[in-house]
Amino acid sequence: MTPIQALIEDAFERRADITPATVTPETKAAIDAVIADIDAGRLRVAEKIAGEWVTHQWLKKAVLLSFRIRDNAVLDDGVSRYFDKVDTKFADWDAARFQAAGFRAVPGAVVRKGSYIAKNTVLMPSFVNIGAFVDEGTMVDTWATVGSCAQIGKNVHLSGGVGIGGVLEPLQANPTIIEDNCFIGARSEIVEGVIVEEGSVISMGVYIGQSTRIFDRETGEVSYGRVPAGSVVVSGNLPSKDGSYSLYCAVIVKKVDAKTRGKVGINELLRGI
């Protein structure tokens, strides 16, 4: 455990006593340093290590602590005024800073400080919360939301109105993760630490949380919390044991590899299911 991690862990145990007036300079400096590192992509709340996703809980704790050490203040983006504890990521950016960052942020895109946006990303009018990581080449389409500490991979498309759940409210153990080369269809919601593995296609209007049954049509298996790599998923229903009613589920209708996905458009994958 590094000294800064130990300091964060200790502060989190005392979080009920920490306020903007009582926080020590050392603790405040440590929290600010961690948020700056997350903002710059030097630290991630979750990362894949040896093929498995690992959540760095101490970083999530630092994000939570950051709300304890600041009072609300007036924020002004030139269009409107706001009252919050977290600055916007672009508050003091000039043209040179945007050019160096290498991504596009159109009017209406709101990104909180303490989230990372990689190069070649496009942010339509959308919201990216503190602690989130958005990797290269990703499109965050209009009215999509990337929740606190969510991890979005390379070349992902989050379609209009998509919701990627956060971990802070309500408090979740692990962040929601969308791996590389995934397509999330319009108005879908992926929440509660669900992992959508690489190359998956989620159709429009699919809702997946930890309690959502994920039914594989080919095998008949039911799983929870993880969409296997290369899955094509639509919304559906499964009957009750007595057949008197049915309940919502997500249905894996087929599996595709990267080669097939590269040759076939998203719409084609979702037709003829």
Curated annotation (Swiss-Prot):
One of its GO terms (cellular component) is cytoplasm. One of its GO terms (molecular function) is nucleotidyltransferase activity. SUPFAM superfamilies: Trimeric LpxA-like enzymes. This is 2,3,4,5-tetrahydropyridine-2,6-dicarboxylate N-succinyltransferase. Keywords: Acyltransferase, Amino-acid biosynthesis, Cytoplasm, Diaminopimelate biosynthesis, Lysine biosynthesis, Repeat, Transferase. Homotrimer. InterPro entries: DapD_Trfase_Hexpep_rpt_fam, Hexapep, Hexapep_transf_CS, THP_succinylTrfase_dom1, THP_succinylTrfase_N_sf, Trimer_LpxA-like_sf. It comes from the Bacteria. It comes from Laribacter hongkongensis (strain HLHK9). Substrate binds at R104, D141. The keyword Transferase applies. It is found in: Cytoplasm. One of its GO terms (biological process) is diaminopimelate biosynthetic process. It catalyses: (S)-2,3,4,5-tetrahydrodipicolinate + succinyl-CoA + H2O = (S)-2-succinylamino-6-oxoheptanedioate + CoA. Belongs to the transferase hexapeptide repeat family. Its EC number is 2.3.1.117.
